[in-house]
UniProtKB/Swiss-Prot annotation:
Belongs to the class I fructose-bisphosphate aldolase family. Gene3D superfamilies: Aldolase class I. It comes from the Bacteria. This is Fructose-bisphosphate aldolase class 1. It is an enzyme of class 4 (lyase). It holds the Pfam family Glycolytic. The gene is fda.
Length: 296
């Protein structure tokens, strides 16, 4: 593990850019960027277009390491190059800590939750991540209803994978998303917090994780998770809120920082001039940074 990057992730001021839309969500991400499905004829072309979009984001002067601590990448992005360097090296050289999305998507809903599908090639992926100088990983589950068994299963699966990831020298971001429209969202979050606390308490002193959570209904609910000795940082997802709404809610939560995807890229368009693009990205970065750093 890179100690300088760990120090930046633990104490740095800023947020994490989530650039990890995978195969399933790529057409939607491209469409929002202004690239329609008739502009590519196969998956390779689609992934090239999305890589071009991400390259435009990370090479922009607005994508500044003074405000962006880290970036989460999709596997395809990790294996591609930006300006002649693997993406992870490009980011690290720029001062942005690289993470890799390692999950294979969600299983069918059961007990009010969606566990992660099996990650059969996790070992090989983590070896490649180390070769590519990746600092940490991210994996997402989804909680839709108040079901204690389901929530327990989600957290147990996350920590089971997290321990394997830690053993490879990487820092896992554990992401048990709570659907923002869940009927008992506030209650779900209390159960989730208790289960996460159990998982954290089961770790050895040197086993470090990060948490990526939905912004809680009750402000500062997760503050003591952020203070847990095994937690590097707690970040939050935008989860379907608009950027303004997500920023507003985030400001009420001390110590939590953003890890936004759609809310970061929502004003970016393929048709923008470089100047327009940099300004739109800069405005988004500034507002998300402000919500992550300057609290109410």
């Amino acid at each position: 593990m890179n100690k300088e990057q760990l120090e930046k992730m633990t104490h740095g001021k800023g947020f994490i850019a989530a650039l990890d839309q995978s195969g399933g969500s790529t057409p939607k991400a491209l469409k929002e960027y202004g690239v329609n499905e008739d502009q590519y004829s196969n998956e390779d072309e689609m992934f090239q277009l999305v890589h071009d979009m991400r390259t435009r984001v990370v090479t922009s002067p607005s994508f500044s390491p003074d405000k962006i601590l880290g970036a989460i990448l999709f596997e395809q992005t990790m294996d591609r190059e930006v300006e002649g360097k693997y993406t992870g090296d490009y980011l690290a050289d720029k001062g942005v800590v690289p993470f890799l999305k390692v999950d294979k998507g969600l299983a069918e809903e059961k007990n009010g939750v969606q566990l992660m599908k099996p990650i059969d090639d996790l070992d090989a992926t983590l070896n490649r991540a180390n070769e590519r100088h990746i600092f940490g990983t991210k994996m997402r589950s989804n909680i839709l209803e108040l079901n204690e068994q389901g929530i327990k299963d989600v957290v147990e699966q996350q920590f089971e994978f997290a321990k394997k990831i830690i053993a490879k020298g990487l820092v896992p971001i554990i992401e048990p998303e709570v659907n923002i429209n869940a009927k008992d969202k506030s209650e779900i979050e209390k159960v989730l917090k208790a289960e996460i606390k159990k998982g954290l308490d089961s770790l050895n002193d040197d086993q470090l994780v990060m948490l990526k959570l939905t912004i809680p209904t009750e402000a500062n609910l997760y503050k003591d998770l952020a203070d847990h000795p095994n937690v590097v940082r707690v970040v939050v997802l935008s989860g379907g809120y608009s950027r303004d709404e997500a920023n507003k809610l985030l400001k009420d939560n001390d110590e939590l920082i953003a890890s936004f995807s759609r809310a970061l890229a929502s004003d970016l368009r393929a048709s923008q001039s470089q100047e327009e693009f940099d300004k739109a990205l800069g405005d988004a970065v500034d507002s998300i940074y402000d919500a992550s750093v300057n609290k109410n």
